[in-house]
């Protein structure tokens, strides 16, 4: 908005001297005055439109004058030719330049700050990106050290693990485990193999002639066959069979153990050496082996008459003429041999039954 100050007003003038003046008419004379005093033309009130003009409109808007006649009526006259004002000077965008410059300064400042931030972030990223590269380059020569032992331990090659020429510790353990099973004589069908060996004619001939002598030699002459046993402990070849529950848990009583054999260190076996005496002892032990199915023997009372029971030597008697022409054993001889393997000791010699009897008597 452009504000203009009004200049000094001139009365009784028909035309205004400036475009920004307000001309007012004098006070009307009373009616009692002479008409000669009313001969003059009534001055007009000229209102400049420039004072009412709003900033931003065009300068073609005309200027009007308001005149009051003798009769007291006001009339609007046409536009008066007034010198045009310099709107270019008034409408100079001087205040607009200042915000433009300030905006530019702010924009440049913001851009410079953004550039600085980008530069800082790039430098930081470069620093962090360079650190792992240096660490990896420093670790690479350490990993590829000239010492062969460290490199083999850290990075073992898969070919060496899979090669059969250089077995691992696991393969060695497996080999030792299988050899240990072979040394102990582990066989799944042991009962069937023993029966086949027992029914052969060679074993029957040896067992009929030297059954008692083989048992005694096996008990007293185990020192001669120490290299055949893995832990110097012979098989149980005695005809004593125990059918009590305690004997099933511990089939070999403590009285039958040979402490000197158990305390001795283990020795290496020699399975390739042929020993007839060992084979005969094994055959005798297979003869006296009890069957796989459980069997409950009759317990002889302590106060009973032994004359009522048959002598146990009858069970040990084997028919010499029991062999058939083909060399196979008859059913009678087989039954007699199986009965001889089921001979039970008297109650006084059975530790388990004595212990049970003591418990019952205490109750």
Curated annotation (Swiss-Prot):
User: Which protein, by its recorded name, is this?
Assistant: Putative transcriptional activator MSA2
Comment field (misc): Present with 861 molecules/cell in log phase SD medium.
Keywords in alphabetical order: Phosphoprotein, Transcription, Transcription regulation
- Organism (species): Saccharomyces cerevisiae (strain ATCC 204508 / S288c) (Baker's yeast)
What does the record list as coiled-coil region(s)?
none
Q: How does it assemble?
A: Interacts with transcription complexes SCB-binding factor (SBF) and MCB-binding factor (MBF). Interacts with SWI4.
Q: A cellular component term (GO) from this record? A: nucleus
A GO BP entry:
G1/S transition of mitotic cell cycle
Lineage, please? Eukaryota, Fungi, Dikarya, Ascomycota, Saccharomycotina
Disulfide bonds, which pairs? Answer: none
């Amino acid at each position: 908005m452009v504000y203009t100050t009004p200049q000094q007003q001139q009365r009784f003038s028909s035309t205004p001297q400036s475009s920004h003046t307000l001309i007012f008419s004098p006070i009307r004379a009373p009616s009692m005055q002479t008409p000669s005093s009313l001969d003059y033309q009534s001055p007009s009130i000229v209102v400049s439109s420039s004072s009412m003009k709003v900033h931003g409109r065009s300068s073609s808007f005309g200027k009007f004058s308001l005149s009051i006649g003798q009769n007291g009526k006001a009339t609007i006259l046409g536009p008066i030719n007034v010198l045009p004002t310099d709107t270019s000077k008034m409408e100079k965008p001087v205040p607009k330049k200042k915000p433009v410059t300030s905006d530019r300064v702010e924009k440049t400042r913001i851009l410079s700050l953004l550039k600085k931030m980008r530069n800082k972030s790039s430098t930081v990223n470069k620093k962090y990106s360079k650190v792992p590269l240096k660490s990896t380059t420093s670790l690479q020569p350490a990993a590829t050290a000239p010492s062969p032992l460290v490199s083999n331990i850290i990075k073992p090659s898969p070919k060496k693990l899979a090669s059969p020429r250089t077995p691992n510790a696991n393969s060695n353990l497996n080999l030792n485990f299988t050899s240990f099973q072979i040394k102990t004589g582990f066989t799944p069908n042991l009962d069937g193999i023993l029966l086949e060996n027992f029914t052969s004619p060679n074993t029957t001939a040896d067992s009929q002639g030297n059954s008692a002598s083989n048992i005694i030699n096996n008990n007293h002459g185990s020192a001669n066959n120490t290299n055949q046993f893995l832990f110097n402990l012979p098989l149980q070849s005695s005809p004593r069979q125990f059918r009590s529950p305690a004997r099933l848990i511990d089939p070999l009583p403590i009285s039958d153990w040979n402490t000197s054999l158990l305390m001795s260190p283990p020795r290496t076996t020699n399975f390739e050496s042929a020993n007839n005496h060992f084979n005969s002892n094994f055959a005798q032990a297979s003869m006296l082996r009890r069957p796989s199915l459980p069997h409950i023997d009759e317990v002889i009372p302590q106060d009973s008459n032994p004359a009522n029971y048959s002598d146990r030597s009858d069970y040990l008697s084997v028919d010499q003429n029991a062999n058939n022409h083909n060399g196979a054993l008859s059913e009678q001889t087989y039954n007699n041999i199986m009965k001889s393997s089921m001979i039970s000791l008297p109650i006084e010699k059975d530790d388990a039954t004595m212990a049970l009897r003591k418990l019952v008597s205490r109750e």
